[in-house]
C-alpha cells in the first residue's frame, strides 16, 4: 500500500491534492494575462494534462505495488541500500551498485517527510495510518514525484527557449504556449519515463536533476550572472552527478559549451563591413587575415541548424577555437563553474579508481561507437508522429515523380535518355531532401562511416544475451544477431533515421532551405542584404519553418550524447532518456496560420481558440499512450518462469516480467 492507497476514505481527496499540486507548479500570473481566453485555455490544458498524467502514474504505481510487491530486478539492489540510509547506516554500501547515492538521499527526505505527515494525519484519524506499507511501495513513490518535477522543469525550459527565439521587439512577459504545454505532457508520457515511474530506479530523478541544471543554464543566458548564481550552478551540477556519473557530459560539455558560445557572442562587435569586403577578397592571405580578425572579435560562424551543412561544422569549430583563444578571460568568467564541476569529478574518479562505484568488472568503459547508430532508430521510433510531415511530403514527392515519369509517351523517349532522366530525377530528389548545400556524395560518406562502425564497434554485452526480460534482448535477437549480414543491411536505415532526426531538430524543410552567408553571427550582416524570396513567402504563408536551434547547439548536443553513450558497453533504453528529452525539448513548433482579419463564423472562432495546436503532438500523445498500455500489459499480465533444459524452475521459481 502506497501514499495514494493510504487514504481509502475518499478517492476524491487524492484527486484534489494532486490537482492542487499541479496549480503549485504553474507560476502565478497577472490579471491581464488571466483575462485572455486563449491563455486561460492553455493554463487549463496544462493543469488538466498534468493531472491526468499524475493520476495515470498513481494508478500504474498501485498496480505494480499490488502485482509486484517485492523488489524486482535492479530494485533488489536499490531498495535494500535505500533502507540502510533510512535506518541511519550511512557507511554501508552494496558493491553491486554502480551509481552514486543521490536517489537514496532524495528518497530519505521524501520518506521522512511522508512518515511525519502520515503520523500527523493518523493522530487525527486512525484510518490515515500507514500500517502495512512496504518498503518497496514507499520508495517507488519517489519516482511519481520525479515525474512532477520533470513536468515543471520541462515547461520552464521551454519557456526560456521560446523567449529566446521570440522577436526582439516583442513586448510584455512571455507566457507558456500551447506547444510548450503539450510538449511537457508528452515528455512525461515518454514510455521509458512513464514505465519507470512505478519502479525504484535512478533514471527519473537523474533526468530531473539534469533538467534543473539545464533550466539554470537557460536562465544564465538571459540574465547577468552573479557569484551566487555561479555557486548555484556548481551545486546543481554536483547534484546531477550524485544521480549518475554520465551526467557530467551534459553539465560540463553541453551546458558549459553553450555558455562558452554565449560568452563569445555576447562580446561580438559589429563587423558587417569587414564581412562584405571579405566575401569579395581574391587574395588568400588577405582573406585569412580578415576572417581571423572577424572570428577573434567574437563573430563566429554559427548558422541555423536548418541551413547548415557538414562544411559549416568545420567552420564553426575553427571560428569558435579562434574566438575562444582571443576572448579567453570572458569565456573563463562564464564557464568557471563547469570547469570546477569537471575538476571535482576528476577528483572523484581518482579517489574511486574508476567511474563506476561497484561491479567494476561488468561495467568497464569501452569505445562503443555503435551506440551512436542505435540512438537514431530509437528516436525515430518514439518520435515517429513528429516526422509524419516529412515522410508524407517525401512520399508525395516520389509519387509525383513516378506519375510524371510514367505520363510521358514511351515512344518519345529512347532507352538511353530515359535512364538519364531517371538518374537525374533521383539525384535531384536526394539533393532536395538533404541539408542545404550538402552534396549527394556525403550520403555515401555517412553510410561508409556507419559501415565501418558496424564492422569494428558492434559490441554485444553478455547481459544483453543472458537476460530475456528486456526488450533489447529481442531487438538484438531478431535483428543483428539473426544473420551476420543483417547488421550491414541496417546501415541505410541508420543513416535515414539520423537525417530525419536532424531535420526535425532544425525546424525547417530542407528542400526550402537557403544557403546562408559565410558568416552568421550577432552583429554581422549577411553578404546578401535582401532576404530570399522563398523565405518571405514562407513567413507570409505562416508555415512552421521557424524556431530551430543553431548549429553550435546541435553539435554540442551530439557531442554530449556521444560521450554519454559510447562509453557504455550495454545497450539499454534507459540510457537514452536524457538525450531524447534534451532533443525533444528543442524540437521547434509548427507555425499555425492565424485567421485573417475580418473573418467571422464558428470555424474562425474555433481556429482562434485552437490556434497553436499541433496535430503532431496529438498523434504523439496517442502513440505514447498505446506504447505505455502495451508495455504495462506485458509487465503485469504476461509473467513467466525461467526453466532449465530439464524443465526445472530457476531463480527459486520467481516470476519474470518483460520491461524496457
UniProtKB/Swiss-Prot annotation:
Keyword Transferase: yes
Catalysis: reaction(s): an alpha-D-Glc-(1->3)-alpha-D-Glc-(1->3)-alpha-D-Man-(1->2)-alpha-D-Man-(1->2)-alpha-D-Man-(1->3)-[alpha-D-Man-(1->2)-alpha-D-Man-(1->3)-[alpha-D-Man-(1->2)-alpha-D-Man-(1->6)]-alpha-D-Man-(1->6)]-beta-D-Man-(1->4)-beta-D-GlcNAc-(1->4)-alpha-D-GlcNAc-diphospho-di-trans,poly-cis-dolichol + a di-trans,poly-cis-dolichyl beta-D-glucosyl phosphate = a alpha-D-Glc-(1->2)-alpha-D-Glc-(1->3)-alpha-D-Glc-(1->3)-alpha-D-Man-(1->2)-alpha-D-Man-(1->2)-alpha-D-Man-(1->3)-[alpha-D-Man-(1->2)-alpha-D-Man-(1->3)-[alpha-D-Man-(1->2)-alpha-D-Man-(1->6)]-alpha-D-Man-(1->6)]-beta-D-Man-(1->4)-beta-D-GlcNAc-(1->4)-alpha-D-GlcNAc-diphospho-di-trans,poly-cis-dolichol + a di-trans,poly-cis-dolichyl phosphate + H(+)
InterPro entries reported in the protein's UniProt record: Alg10
Any single GO BP term: dolichol-linked oligosaccharide biosynthetic process
Keywords: Endoplasmic reticulum, Glycosyltransferase, Membrane, Transferase, Transmembrane, Transmembrane helix
Residues of the signal peptide: none
Record-level Gene Ontology MF annotations: dolichyl pyrophosphate Glc2Man9GlcNAc2 alpha-1,2-glucosyltransferase activity
Tagged with keyword Glycosyltransferase: yes
Subcellular localization(s) per the UniProt record: Endoplasmic reticulum membrane
Chain spans, region Disordered: 526-547
Record's bilayer topology term: Multi-pass membrane protein
Comp. bias regions, Basic and acidic residues: 534-546
Residue ranges crossing the lipid bilayer per the database entry: 6-26, 44-64, 135-155, 185-205, 235-255, 305-325, 338-358, 367-387, 434-454, 488-508, 551-571, 617-637
Annotated PANTHER family: ALPHA-1,2-GLUCOSYLTRANSFERASE ALG10, DOL-P-GLC:GLC(2)MAN(9)GLCNAC(2)-PP-DOL ALPHA-1,2-GLUCOSYLTRANSFERASE-RELATED
Family statement drawn from the similarity comment of this UniProt entry: Belongs to the ALG10 glucosyltransferase family.
Protein name according to UniProt: Dol-P-Glc:Glc(2)Man(9)GlcNAc(2)-PP-Dol alpha-1,2-glucosyltransferase
Species: Pyricularia oryzae (strain 70-15 / ATCC MYA-4617 / FGSC 8958) (Rice blast fungus)
Protein's gene: ALG10
Amino acid at each position: 500500500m502506497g501514499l495514494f492507497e493510504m487514504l481509502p476514505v475518499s478517492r476524491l481527496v487524492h484527486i484534489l491534492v494532486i490537482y492542487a499540486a499541479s496549480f503549485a507548479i504553474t507560476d502565478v500570473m497577472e490579471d491581464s494575462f488571466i483575462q485572455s481566453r486563449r491563455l486561460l485555455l492553455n493554463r487549463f490544458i496544462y493543469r488538466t494534462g498534468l493531472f491526468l498524467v499524475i493520476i495515470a502514474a498513481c494508478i500504474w504505481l498501485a498496480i505494480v505495488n499490488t502485482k509486484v510487491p517485492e523488489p524486482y530486478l535492479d530494485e533488489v539492489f536499490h531498495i535494500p541500500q535505500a533502507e540502510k540510509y533510512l535506518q541511519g547506516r550511512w557507511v554501508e554500501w552494496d558493491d553491486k551498485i554502480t551509481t552514486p547515492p543521490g536517489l537514496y538521499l532524495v528518497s530519505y527526505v521524501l520518506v521522512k517527510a511522508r512518515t511525519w505527515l502520515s503520523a500527523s494525519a493518523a493522530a487525527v484519524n486512525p484510518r490515515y495510518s500507514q500500517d502495512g506499507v512496504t518498503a518497496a511501495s514507499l520508495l517507488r513513490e519517489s519516482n511519481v514525484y520525479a515525474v512532477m518535477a520533470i513536468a515543471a522543469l520541462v515547461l520552464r525550459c521551454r519557456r526560456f527557449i521560446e523567449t529566446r527565439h521570440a522577436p526582439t521587439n516583442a513586448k510584455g512577459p512571455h507566457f507558456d504556449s500551447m506547444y510548450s504545454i503539450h510538449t511537457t505532457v508528452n515528455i512525461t508520457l515518454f514510455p521509458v519515463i512513464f514505465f519507470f515511474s512505478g519502479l525504484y530506479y535512478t533514471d527519473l530523478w537523474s533526468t530531473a536533476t539534469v533538467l534543473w541544471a539545464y533550466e539554470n543554464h537557460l536562465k544564465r543566458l538571459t540574465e547577468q550572472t552573479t557569484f551566487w548564481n555561479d555557486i548555484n550552478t556548481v551545486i546543481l551540477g554536483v547534484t546531477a552527478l550524485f544521480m549518475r556519473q554520465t551526467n557530467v557530459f551534459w553539465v560540463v560539455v553541453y551546458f558549459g559549451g553553450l555558455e562558452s558560445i554565449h560568452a563569445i557572442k555576447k562580446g561580438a562587435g559589429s563587423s558587417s563591413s569587414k564581412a562584405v569586403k571579405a566575401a569579395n577578397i581574391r587574395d588568400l592571405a588577405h582573406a585569412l587575415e580578415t576572417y581571423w580578425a572577424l572570428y577573434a572579435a567574437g563573430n563566429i560562424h554559427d548558422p541555423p541548424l536548418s541551413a547548415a551543412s557538414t562544411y559549416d561544422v568545420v567552420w564553426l569549430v575553427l571560428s569558435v577555437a579562434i574566438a575562444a583563444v582571443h576572448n579567453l578571460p570572458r569565456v573563463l568568467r562564464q564557464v568557471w563553474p563547469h570547469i570546477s564541476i569537471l575538476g571535482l569529478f576528476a577528483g572523484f574518479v581518482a579517489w574511486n579508481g574508476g567511474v563506476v562505484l561497484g561491479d567494476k568488472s561488468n561495467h568497464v568503459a569501452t569505445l562503443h561507437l555503435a551506440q551512436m547508430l542505435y540512438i537514431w532508430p530509437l528516436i525515430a521510433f518514439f518520435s515517429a508522429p513528429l516526422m509524419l510531415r516529412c515522410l508524407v511530403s517525401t512520399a508525395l514527392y516520389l509519387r509525383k515523380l513516378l506519375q510524371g515519369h510514367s505520363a510521358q509517351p514511351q515512344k518519345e523517349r529512347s532507352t538511353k535518355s530515359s535512364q538519364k532522366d531517371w538518374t537525374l530525377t533521383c539525384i535531384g530528389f536526394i539533393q532536395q531532401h538533404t541539408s542545404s548545400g550538402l552534396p549527394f556524395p556525403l550520403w555515401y560518406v555517412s553510410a561508409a562511416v556507419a559501415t565501418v562502425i558496424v564492422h569494428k564497434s558492434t559490441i554485444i554485452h553478455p547481459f544483453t544475451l543472458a537476460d530475456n526480460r528486456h526488450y533489447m534482448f529481442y531487438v538484438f535477437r531478431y535483428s543483428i544477431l539473426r544473420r551476420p549480414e543483417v547488421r550491414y543491411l541496417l546501415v541505410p536505415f541508420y543513416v535515414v533515421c539520423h537525417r530525419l532526426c536532424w531535420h526535425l531538430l532544425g525546424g525547417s524543410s530542407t528542400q526550402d532551405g537557403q544557403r546562408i552567408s559565410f558568416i552568421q553571427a550577432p552583429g554581422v550582416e549577411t553578404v546578401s542584404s535582401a532576404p530570399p524570396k522563398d523565405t518571405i513567402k514562407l513567413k507570409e504563408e505562416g508555415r512552421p519553418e521557424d524556431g530551430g536551434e543553431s548549429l553550435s547547439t546541435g553539435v554540442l548536443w551530439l557531442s554530449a550524447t556521444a560521450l554519454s553513450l559510447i562509453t557504455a558497453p550495454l545497450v539499454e533504453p534507459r540510457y537514452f532518456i536524457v538525450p531524447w528529452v534534451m532533443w525533444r525539448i528543442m524540437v521547434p513548433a509548427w507555425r499555425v496560420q492565424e485567421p485573417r482579419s475580418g473573418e467571422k463564423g464558428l470555424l474562425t472562432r474555433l481556429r482562434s481558440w485552437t490556434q497553436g495546436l499541433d496535430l503532431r503532438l496529438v498523434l504523439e500523445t496517442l502513440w505514447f499512450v498505446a506504447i505505455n498500455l502495451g508495455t504495462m500489459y506485458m509487465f503485469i499480465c504476461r509473467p513467466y518462469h525461467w526453466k532449465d533444459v530439464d524443465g526445472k524452475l530457476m531463480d527459486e521459481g520467481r516470476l519474470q516480467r518483460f520491461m524496457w
